[in-house]
């Protein structure tokens, strides 16, 4: 049930503030999903 706790605390993780996250059972923590622009390093170009 540690996984459920990780999901609940996910909102408290800054990087998860506006994105989905998944639970990493092995590490017993919450992993934030990256935006596509983060994977390719193009986030800055998308900002107005």
UniProtKB/Swiss-Prot annotation:
One of the record's GO molecular function terms: ion channel inhibitor activity
UniProt signal peptide: none
Disulfide bonds: 3-16, 10-21, 15-32, 23-30
Pfam families found in the cross-reference section: Toxin_9 (PF02819)
Domain of life from the UniProt record: Eukaryota
GO cellular component, one term: extracellular region
Principal location: secreted
Keyword Secreted: yes
Classification via InterPro entries: Spidertoxin
Subcellular location: Secreted
Record-stated family: Belongs to the neurotoxin 02 (plectoxin) family.
Job of this protein: The toxin blocks voltage-gated calcium channels in rat cerebellar granule cells (IC(50)=200 nM).
Descriptive protein name: Omega-agatoxin-Aa5a
Species per Swiss-Prot/TrEMBL record: Agelenopsis aperta
Lineage, opening ranks: Eukaryota, Metazoa, Ecdysozoa, Arthropoda, Chelicerata
């Amino acid at each position: 049930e540690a996984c459920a706790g990780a999901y609940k605390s996910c909102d408290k993780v800054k990087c998860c503030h506006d994105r989905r996250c998944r639970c990493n059972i092995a590490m017993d923590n919450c992993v934030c999903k990256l935006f596509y622009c983060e994977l390719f390093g193009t986030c800055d170009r998308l900002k107005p």
